[in-house]
Each structure stands twice: as structure tokens, then as C-alpha cells.
Design a protein with these regions (language model features):
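Conserved small-residue packing positions in alpha-helical repeats and bundles
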Residues: 18-19
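Solvent-exposed loop and edge beta-strand segments that line ligand/cofactor-binding
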Residues: 1-15, 67-78
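Non-catalytic C-terminal accessory modules of carbohydrate-active enzymes
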Residues: 29-199
Length: 199
């Protein structure tokens, strides 16, 4: 990745695994660098060239020259590289469901938001059978403010990137501090709205 100046070099089959693998291996900043790559190939390259959907080719249209890619393979609404959406939801917003039967279907919610790169904020929601989950964070001058809502009849386990619980201030909600291990502060949440400040 570094030899290619933080450009992608995988195809349709590898793209869905790349950012999650980097995150899992502790290379989240590198994953953010790939997300924020403005050159070709890269997700923002398409956006800079006018994309509002995921294109089949990174260079389906080049705004500066007004040219289109090979018309035999040039869909402007093609999921192939769309796995970035899953990474944004599961990693940047941190919205996940449990894998055990009693946790599935968002009965038990796992929130593991992650910030990095040049992103200054992230905000999203997930509709579930129990109601809407929201997750958002914003970088402030010397802190990060994280907000979430947990729907009725569910519980959530929140893991915030923080050195310990002392670096996390609860601004809204009655979160119960759980553990703090290796740069992560954990909390147990019931339905309601919560706001945290991480210093």
C-alpha cells in the first residue's frame, strides 16, 4: 500500500476484506488513508469526478476531460467497490450486532466507534426491528464528543477508544462503566440517549 502511495491495488474480490483486515491488525490509520485517497484508484476519486453512487470502474467518468470509461463495462450504479459502506458502518460508526443467538438481530448492540485520518465527524443510523440506533462522533479542539441512541427493549456494549475511564466524561445518560483494557473504555448501556466526551 505504501509503495503505491496509499492507492488501492486489489480487485472486486479483495476489496471487501482489505479495510476490515487493516483495522483488525491495528492499522486503522492506513485504512483511513485508503478511504481518503483522492487519486485513482480510490473512493474519493469517483466522488471528485461527480459520483453520487458506487461506480463499476474507478474512472468511469473523468470530469476534467469530460470522458467516459469503456462503455462495455461502465455501470454508474454497481456494488463491486461498495463494501466501503460496510466498513464505515461497522468501524467508523461502530454499529454491530452480536453473533450469539440471544444477541442477534440487534437485540444486543455492540458499538465500537473509531476515528482517524482527516475525518472530523461521522454520523449515521441503523434501523432495526426494535427501532433506530444512532451513532455519531465529532472531533473538537482537544477532545472527541460521541453520541448514541439505543432503542427500547435492547441493550448495548459500548467500547470507546480511550486510555481509561478517567479520560471519558459522561455528558448524557446513565452509562455503567465496565472495563478499561489496552486503550479501550467499555460501558454497558440500556435504551436511551448517551453523550460522552473523550479527552
Amino acid at each position: 500500500i505504501h509503495r503505491r502511495d496509499n492507492h488501492l491495488s486489489v480487485g472486486f474480490l479483495g476489496i471487501s476484506h482489505l479495510l476490515p483486515a487493516l483495522t483488525k491488525c491495528g492499522q486503522n490509520e492506513l485504512a483511513f488513508a485508503l478511504l481518503e485517497q483522492k487519486g485513482n484508484p480510490g473512493w474519493l476519486y469517483s466522488v471528485i469526478n461527480g459520483a453520487t453512487t458506487i461506480w463499476e470502474r474507478w474512472n468511469s467518468y473523468i470530469a476534467e476531460t469530460g470522458t467516459f470509461g469503456d462503455v462495455s463495462m461502465n455501470s454508474f450504479n454497481h456494488y463491486a467497490y461498495g463494501s466501503i459502506g460496510q466498513w464505515l458502518y461497522r468501524t467508523v460508526l461502530g454499529i454491530q450486532t452480536g453473533e450469539n443467538t440471544d444477541e442477534s438481530g440487534y437485540h444486543k448492540i455492540f458499538l465500537t466507534p473509531s476515528w482517524g485520518g482527516a475525518l472530523s465527524f461521522a454520523k449515521g443510523e441503523q434501523e432495526t426491528p426494535f427501532g433506530k440506533i444512532t451513532s455519531s462522533w465529532e472531533k473538537k479542539e482537544n477532545s472527541i464528543v460521541y453520541h448514541c441512541t439505543i432503542p427500547a427493549n435492547t441493550t448495548a456494549h459500548l467500547s470507546l477508544p480511550a486510555s481509561d475511564h478517567n479520560s471519558v466524561q459522561i455528558l448524557e445518560g446513565a452509562a455503567i462503566a465496565d472495563t478499561a483494557v489496552s486503550g479501550v473504555a467499555d460501558f454497558e448501556l440500556v435504551s436511551g440517549s448517551y453523550t460522552f466526551k473523550i479527552c
